[in-house]
Amino acid sequence: DQFYIASAATSTEEIWNGIGNPVYPPAREELARHGISCKGKRAVQLTKADYDKYDYILGMDHWNLKNMLRILKADPEGKVKLLLDYSDNPRDIADPWYTGGFDVTYSDVVEGCEAFLRYLQNIKKL
């Protein structure tokens, strides 16, 4: 009950006539290998209104960051960051659409989520 987590695209490449595509099959397969279902999930795009809905808006790479700031117009509260900024090894997370490394991307996302959780615990948000 402490978290509301959503995923949103920074482009419309996977959204046609207002309807988002389902999760890309190789990504869905990687998630399934880890017991994670993405059934019913479809692409949605980040909106300016999302800024007020969320305490943190995390991107995967610097290209995401640039696009998030373009969509949001500003980040006066410092909510927009890269997921791996919270890790001991800050870096971009490679887009597996281009690399094919869905397993590597999954590992990087897990690393970032675990680091972000530790950050929240350290600042007493949990």
Where are these regions (language model features)?
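Conserved active-site segments centered on acidic
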Residues: 1-53, 118-126
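A structural signal for well-ordered alpha-helical scaffolds and beta->alpha junctions
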Residues: 20-24, 61, 113
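Phosphate-binding/catalytic loops
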Residues: 56, 62-126
